[in-house]
A protein has these predicted regions:
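Short hydrophobic alpha-helices and adjacent helix-cap/hinge residues
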Residues: 2-5, 10, 17, 21-203
């Protein structure tokens, strides 16, 4: 009973935060919601993954995938790491949260980089001339949950992202992708989200 009440409390807080956010537009960028706004929401969403605590074992490492030769990508990655570092203690309950930037332009083997840094969650910045399927193949094989601020990446195969719906941020979830990466998202979260991909019709 307490667990259910806690889940609804988190859901209420998340809905309140989404409703309170004013619209902001980032010109010439692919992210739909400003990084400083999206990161706290995405981290709250992670609280709805029933499998995350067991996989993280007290310490969650968020990898931030970017391209150093693509300025937009590099700038977003910098902002994401800064936003993660600025989160208050307890943002993920008792789990310690850390960030590691992974430069795709300087990485010959993404799977090795993720394993070496013990990444459990991967934020994907805007990428250029990259086959997203190569990223999702690695994330699914390693059981790493993917996040992004680029809505179309979720439709293409990443697990969780944010879009704008009117004047408010909208949670977007590719349910099949999230399950393929090992996440077990609660029904409470799915009711708050726009579900896309193969799992959209059967939550």
């Amino acid at each position: 009973m307490k667990a259910r009440a806690g889940a609804w409390l988190i859901a209420g807080l998340l809905l309140g935060e989404l409703a309170a956010l004013a619209p902001r537009v980032l010109a010439a960028q692919e992210v739909a919601v400003p990084v400083a706004v999206q990161v706290p929401i995405l981290v709250k969403i992670l609280n709805f993954d029933r499998n995350l605590a067991g996989r993280a074992a007290g310490r969650l490492v968020v990898g931030v995938l970017f391209q150093s030769r693509y300025r937009t990508s590099a700038n977003v990655a910098d902002e994401v790491c800064l936003a993660l570092q600025a989160l208050p203690a307890g943002a993920l309950g008792a789990m310690e949260l850390s960030c590691v930037a992974i430069d795709l332009d300087a990485t010959s083997a993404l799977d090795s980089a993720l394993k070496r840094n013990r990444v459990q969650v991967l934020y994907v910045s805007p990428l250029r001339a990259v086959a997203l399927g190569d990223v999702t193949a690695v994330s699914r094989a390693a059981g790493i949950t993917t996040l992004t601020g680029v809505p179309r990446y979720v439709e293409t195969g990443l697990a969780i992202g944010l879009d704008m719906k009117g004047e408010r941020p909208e949670i977007v979830i590719n349910l099949a992708a999230s399950r393929a990466e090992g996440a077990d998202l609660t029904a409470h979260l799915l009711k708050l989200a726009r579900v896309v991909g193969d799992g959209a019709g059967g939550q």
